[in-house]
Amino acid sequence: MLIEVDLPADFPPPRVPREPIARNLRDIIPAGKGRVDKAEYLARLRRGQRAGMRSLLTLMNTEHSHDWRRPTVVCIVGGGPSLAEEVGALRHLIKRGEKVLAVNKSHDWLLQPGLRCDYAALLDPKEWVADYIDLDLAAAKSTRKRAGKFWAPPKYLIASQCHDLVLEKFKHRKEAYMWHAAAGLGESEILKTEFADELWVNIAGASVIGLRAVGLAHGLGFREMHLFGIDGSMKPAADDSSPKLYAYDKPHIDKTWKAFEVKLTSGWRRAFMANHHMARSVYEFEDSMRDWDRQIKAGKMEPFSLRVHGNPDYSAIAMVAAGMGVHAAAEENETYGKAPPKT
């Protein structure tokens, strides 16, 4: 897949000229190390480890099924605009008894109408993330019976890189668990030497929590994953609305808008609009898919399946997923897996 970028771009609507500048998005928006520098990242790692929360390691493989014919299933729910159109598919999986891992404000989006939420994960280091989760929502629905299934309050998976306000909010809660976002900055060496007698776990992956959650889910033991609201792009404006980067309101939105074009190896190409970190997530999704495949083939990772839900017309990750044959809709995989019709 080649991702081409046209800079600068008008907004709205997304625009790519007839002859776009063929520059790989990796060169324009390089892989990030997060929103804090190395010194602050490692300082937060130490503070997080000392916060007193239980380690996520104590939950590892708790969702593992010993029946290979029936792998445990999880729905990873992000906040992309396609989420609003995929509620029916999500409800179907929940009704079937499948579990849900929410990221960021999706926790509240799920609980407000009474949908299931078993896990909620946070990673972003900014202070406003402390307001992403309303703990009163979970408390008001401590045990619910939905679709014949009993389910318990969410478990909160908090990255050590989160802001101190986030740690303060969760550090005394028995249902909160600490993990570290691996970034290749020497964090493993620090944990091994300074916290040798303590439990800890590093989770590698993409820079956005929606994709890093795949590693979290795999560590918990899930072997079939459905991604909802993981788009990497915005939904263009309809006649009576504004463009949408999220399915719900967020108080802080990065408005570094870029127009970019995704070109699949099958020949399909389409323009999308996103901000920096969302655009980065598109190529991180492709890179992650290839990395997981290499690790599985090398015997370093247990096999798992992944399905992406979303409309490829405006969801860049859904389009890439369809081109790689992992879209939840078989017809989308068939469409984007072959050359587009000639016009």
Segments predicted by a language model, with ranges:
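Metal-ion/cofactor- or nucleotide/acyl-coenzyme-handling active-site neighborhoods
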Residues: 1-343
